[in-house]
Amino acid sequence: PIETHAMVDACIEAFNISGEKKWVDNAVMCFNWFLGHNDLNMVLYDPKSGGCRDGLMADGINQNEGAESTLACLLSHLTLQKHYADQTLKKAAP
């Protein structure tokens, strides 16, 4: 999860520098890893607890929901939300 968060941040920063939409698409693709678009097709984010599983293993997901993984998931989500809010404000600006 930590690496996924780093990739989301890096992709959004690449968009901020280049303006190329492909970087936003890549950030969303990275975030979707938490939601089951991963090698095991298993969801790591648990909406009931608000936590995130600690990672993928050969035989499934690590059921622990550590603070580091949860923060990685939630901060990735906030990064995308902020990006979309910033873009909405830019479009609304005179």
Residue positions per predicted region:
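Glycan-recognition and catalytic cores of secretory/periplasmic carbohydrate-active enzymes
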Residues: 1-94
